[in-house]
Amino acid sequence: MRTKSLKKNRINVVTLGCSKNVYDSEILMGQLKANDKDVVHEEDGNIVVINTCGFIDNAKEQSVNTILEFVEKKQQGDVDKVFVTGCLSERYKPDLQKEIPDVDQYFGTTELPGLLSALEADYKHELIGERLTTTPKNYAYLKIAEGCDRPCSFCAIPLMRGGHKSTPIENLVTEAEKLAANGVKELILIAQDLTYYGLDLYKKRNLAELLENLVKVEGIEWIRLHYAFPTGFPMDVLEVMKREPKVCNYLDIPLQHISDDLLKSMRRGTTHEKTTKLLKEFRKTVPEMAIRTTLIVGYPGETEEHYQELKEWVKEMRFERLGCFTYSHEENTHAYNLEDDVPQEVKQERANEIMEIQSQISWELNQQKIGEVFNVVIDRKEGNYFIGRTEYDSPDVDNEVLIDATTVYLKTGDYYDVKIAEAADFDLYGEPLNVTTEKPKRKELKIKSV
């Protein structure tokens, strides 16, 4: 069926899931632009590409619902073609083809050339690092590796993304230079496992050397690290963080649990004692570091004693940033062979309690910031506030700094010294120092008479 409108050859890329998917969609859109294809936003395209997530049940449900939504639009004649790619398609392609046959074609996570061909575009190998960024202009994700070699019992990522494959340092530097040339000032380094970076290419953990090369890129102000693994963490990274002002005093390191019984069952390769020692070493070496972690509650076999151990440990460690999720029983994982024996309501109660504890910790830590001055980047304006972040905060998941937009003019993407005046549990309220109080007036256009 043909679309009701004349929107021909306009491609809408819909991205679901994590920052790695955002990056992959940006690469796809960069390739499409290089092929002179018209890439558009929601509702404007007659061709739709859905980049799905297949990590946990909620993400899978969202992906399936999105596919069904666009299939219905196709049936109604509002779009011509629907293509599906990403982790859900990689993991469940035969099932999806059977259950939702109205999708024109399904592609896995490594089938970009095939997807481009279906979109009547050529895969251009020479476009190293060139993409169409969808994040605010001041920051961008830099994916330094694909896949994962860890054997974590609960995780299906290796099924969808394959083994760990590091991107060469020179390629990443080239990509960073191109991003900086386009106005990007903050690089958020992402991978399934930053800790492993370089072992496959250089036979050693090479994250520190990568950072030393990236800090030389002109125009980059901040470099942020996301998704490290505790076992085998390269401690020389801390020395670079301490020495190089461009490397944010920030580390996202998912720890999942602290009970030795569960860490063993999860196949995390560490213990309560080793994990605590590692975190204390982080704080000793880089005292200003903000540590973000994520935890899982309700894993098979988690008893009340295991949970209490985790809860007390969270109180002891006082993480600057923390997220807590309920366990999702994923087929084809090692843990799927275990009984999912913690009731869902108990899982949710435990997650809620952990987040209540973290909210109090965050409030207490934020109160200590009142009166201090921080360098803040402005991400956007919402209503009567400019919204920014410190180097201790990543976009979307961490604290934000709110500045009254009725009293001062700030430029999105710029950095300002901001004095903190008030603090809530996850928000800071600040006053910028030494800035103009008015938005610059537009210059009048003077037309000379002839």
Swiss-Prot record:
Chain ranges of the MTTase N-terminal domain? 9-124
- The entry's [4Fe-4S] cluster 1-binding residues are 18, 53, 87
Matching CDD domains: Radical_SAM
Q: What Pfam families does the entry give?
A: Radical_SAM, TRAM_2, UPF0004
> Which Gene3D superfamilies has this protein been placed in?
Methylthiotransferase, N-terminal domain (3.40.50.12160), Nucleic acid-binding proteins (2.40.50.140), tm_1862 like domain (3.80.30.20)
Name the top EC class. transferase
GO BP, one annotated term: tRNA modification
- Residues forming the Radical SAM core domain are 134-365
For activity, the cofactor(s) needed are: [4Fe-4S] cluster
Under the cellular component aspect of Gene Ontology, which terms does the record hold? cytosol
Entry's EC annotation: 2.8.4.4
Domain of life of the organism encoding this protein: Bacteria
Q: What is its main location?
A: cytoplasm
User: Which positions does UniProt annotate for [4Fe-4S] cluster 2 binding?
Assistant: 148, 152, 155
UniProt-listed InterPro entries: Elp3/MiaA/NifB-like_rSAM, Methylthiotransferase, Methylthiotransferase_CS, Methylthiotransferase_N, Methylthiotransferase_N_sf, NA-bd_OB-fold, Ribosomal_uS12_MeSTrfase_RimO, rSAM
Q: Where in the cell is it found?
A: Cytoplasm
User: How the cofactor binds, per note?
Assistant: Binds 2 [4Fe-4S] clusters. One cluster is coordinated with 3 cysteines and an exchangeable S-adenosyl-L-methionine.
Molecular function (GO) terms for this protein are: 4 iron, 4 sulfur cluster binding; aspartic acid methylthiotransferase activity; metal ion binding; protein methylthiotransferase activity
Keywords attached to this entry: 4Fe-4S, Cytoplasm, Iron, Iron-sulfur, Metal-binding, S-adenosyl-L-methionine, Transferase
Q: Which residue ranges does the record assign to the TRAM domain?
A: 367-434
Function, in words: Catalyzes the methylthiolation of an aspartic acid residue of ribosomal protein uS12.
Q: Which family does it belong to?
A: Belongs to the methylthiotransferase family. RimO subfamily.
Q: What is the protein name given in its UniProt record?
A: Ribosomal protein uS12 methylthiotransferase RimO
The protein's organism comes out as Christiangramia forsetii (strain DSM 17595 / CGMCC 1.15422 / KT0803)
